[in-house]
């Protein structure tokens, strides 16, 4: 499966992506700490991750609804989009990681999330959530640009560098007047 939005392509995982994933999980981890700086990313066993990703690829059927797609820009694998249903929710939450630094701040995240939402809209979904924290200015700016609105704030949910930070839940609801 492949979806293109401007210079961004969302696509299924390929074997050539595995080494990037290993690097992002073990050495080039700054993307993780921008997203969840209060957590610690434990290094992964490369062989274990390789087997896990190969299993995911092997089990993927053409008609399966995707929960994860890789992001490619300028012909390069740079990150991923994913989705999940938060506990007790029937509304899909979206996630995005631009793991390659030089591709951040260029609108690629907004294009990737737009393409991902359009993919799910084909299945009748018109509401989406994003979960982030008050210090993630890049994600908050992207969310606002895409029309997400804050629906819940939990003050002091996280401690980052000794300071309290808020958990923020944002939602986008496509309206009757927006194109499908």
PLM features per residue range, with description:
Residues 1, 161-180:
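Terminal substrate-recognition subdomain of acyl/acetyltransferases
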Residues 1-50, 176-180:
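A short, well-structured alpha-helix characteristic of acyl/acetyltransferase catalytic modules
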Residues 99, 130-140:
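Conserved beta-strand-loop-alpha-helix junction that forms the acyl-donor binding cleft
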Residues 105-119, 137, 141-145:
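Conserved acetyl-CoA-binding loop-helix of GNAT-fold acetyltransferases
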Residues 129-132, 149-166:
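Conserved catalytic-core motifs of GNAT/GCN5-like acyltransferases
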Residues 143, 148, 170:
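Conserved active-site tyrosine of GNAT-family acetyltransferases
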């Amino acid at each position: 499966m492949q979806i293109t939005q401007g210079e961004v392509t969302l696509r299924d995982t390929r074997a050539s992506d595995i080494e990037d994933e290993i690097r992002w999980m073990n050495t080039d981890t700054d993307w993780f700490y921008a997203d969840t700086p209060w957590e610690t990313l434990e290094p992964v066993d490369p062989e274990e991750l390789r087997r896990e990703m190969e299993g995911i690829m092997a089990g993927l059927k053409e008609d399966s609804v995707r929960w994860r797609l890789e992001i490619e820009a300028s012909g390069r694998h740079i990150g991923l989009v994913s989705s999940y249903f938060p506990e007790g929710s029937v509304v899909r939450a979206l996630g995005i990681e631009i793991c390659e630094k030089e591709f951040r701040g260029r609108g690629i995240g907004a294009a990737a999330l737009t393409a991902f939402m359009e993919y799910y809209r084909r299945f009748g979904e018109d509401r989406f959530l994003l979960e982030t924290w008050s210090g993630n200015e890049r994600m908050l700016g992207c969310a606002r640009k895409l029309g997400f609105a804050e629906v819940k704030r939990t003050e002091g949910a996280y401690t980052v560098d000794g300071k309290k930070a808020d958990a923020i839940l944002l939602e986008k609801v496509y309206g009757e007047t927006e194109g499908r």
